[in-house]
Amino acid sequence: MNLVLQEIYNFWNIQNSNIRGDEFTGYEPVYDQFDTLDKPAYNKDPEGTVQKVFDLYRSINLVPIVYYTEQGLIRAIRDFASIGYNSVKDNKISLGNNKGQPISRFIFTNMMTAEPKGRGHNSLKDRFYDDKKLKRAINLCYSMREGNKLCYPTAVRRALELVTGENVQNFKPQHARSIVEHLCPVLWGNVYDYSCGYGGRLLGIGSSNMKYNYIGVEPNTETVKYLNYLNDLLDEAVGVRGTIIQDVSEDYQPTDIDCAFSSPPYFNLEKYSDEDTQCMVRYRTLDEWFSGYAEPTI
């Protein structure tokens, strides 16, 4: 197994017994029990139903996201590259297109250690392993939704994101692809991303039929490791490889760029790491941040 993928598996506590194909949640053995814990069961016994669902989740104890083998990742990237998507129309793009997000959510485990300002450790993983928050999320699955599969992993993951406030978000890959194709309708165009983040733009832009040359700058050592892994997967899946540069955008000088597009940090609203290359560490006040980071980057 690839060493980076093994690190990812270790972070998510994935064991061989959890792997149920190239794309899995780990909860496949209890799906039939989830099916019996439907809305009528909840209406009859809310507290008991929530407890039964909670016990099933704790019996496996994996954060309820989609997991992949390496072949599963390659297949998922190919599927992402081939599906239809909403383009920019009248300078607008529709909301809600989350295709590709599960790939980044799985690979970029350090998204789980980033902290919204003032919230401390409150990631999806933290919430899942907090019994009270998990039970609140399960209750939300029933009280706010109708239909089937109310307590399946996707539903519980979405409910956990509603529990106790802010979430560190990744840029939607489909939006990145649509926006860059709108701004830069140039085959093999050079697209500069001055704040790579968790791979949403790399995945979206790298999957475009325009075959862009993606150039991305990112200071975070751990994030760069996962960006390089995603870059390798893109090369294998669709034959496109970007350029990942570990540097700070205020110092890096790009050349021959057709389009610059990114989603930079907003001073200290989110903490990604304690490395001295982080702009919130380098620049201690908002004025210093504007003059030292924002203006040179632009």
Give the residues covered by each predicted segment.
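Class I S-adenosyl-L-methionine-dependent methyltransferase catalytic core
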Residues: 1-78, 85-100, 111-298
